Amino acid sequence: MIHSKPTRNLALDLVRVTEAAALAAGRFMGRGDKNAADKASVDAMRLVLNEVEMDGIIVIGEGEKDEAPMLYNGEHLGTGEPPQVDIAVDPIDGTRPLAHGQYNSLSTVALSPRGTMFNPGPFVYMNKIAVGPEARDVIDIDASVEDNLKAVARAKGMDVNDVTVVILDRPRHEKLISEVRRLGARIRLIPDGDVAGALMTSMPETGIDILMGIGGTPEGVLAACALRCLGGNMQGKIYPRNDVERQKGIELGYDLDKVLKLEDLVSSEDTFFAATGITGGELLHGVSYTGAGATTDSIVMRGLTGTVRRIMAQHRFAKLSRISAINY
């Protein structure tokens, strides 16, 4: 018989955070105003994060304090009570798709024990490779595209031409895309939102087998937290945008040649992750508004137990307005 009581699942607190941000941001779908959408989601996310019983510090936020008035790197959030945690936030992963009324924008947040989350410092981008549980032990970011695709195909009992690779649609990936095509693998190009792309590698129903390419470091850490929960794997390498960023990183002590393994990106298994869809996509449905309120679709997970929940929630604005300062 198990006598110790269950520990608290902070992921269930986090889903209220991402729901609030998604509900606030969803009003701006297709309206062409990224800044207004971002402000609405940041305001809502910060308000609800401050209600969570935790002593949190933002490691992955909206930028440095002089660049971001709220949810900035180093900001303290929560009630100040234990547990002490690192926080990674992306109120809108995919601001451009949201502003243009396109698919695959999400609101995401992750927590892990204090000092366990990788701090990317000045670096905005990293090279990434991510896979699901079946191929978790076979990837190597320093190996060739061909070697990685063949290794993933073998691990999953597939031919290379059955493998589907998700890649951000950017000019910098022209060579990568050409190589994947040469090898005969399938490609899913996404305009933004590689957090969703990384998660889909661990969800067989999406048909995605591997994520490759250069994307944001904040999204990389958030994805790593989720993959810790899902049993997948990820590797990354810092990708300086220019010589100034490279030199600054060296001065701060970063090893630019180091392969960042999943355990380097988030060193604790006791991690929590939540995401709520803003605009619809393959991972989550978007916010759907009615005359009385809205419906949200979220995924929440906990690394310690491996439990993954899907939460479809109905929100009634007339009742919410009595207890919430957020203008939905």
PLM regions with names:
Residues 50-51, 76-82, 90, 98-102, ...:
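Solvent-exposed alpha-helices and their adjacent loops that cap or buttress functional pockets
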Residues 58-62, 87-89, 98-100, 119-120, ...:
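General beta-strand structural signal in soluble alpha/beta enzymes
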Residues 82-93, 97-117:
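DPxDG-like acidic metal-binding loop motif
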Residues 174-175, 197-199, 219-223, 282-283:
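Short acidic/glycine-rich loop or secondary-structure boundary segments that cap or lie
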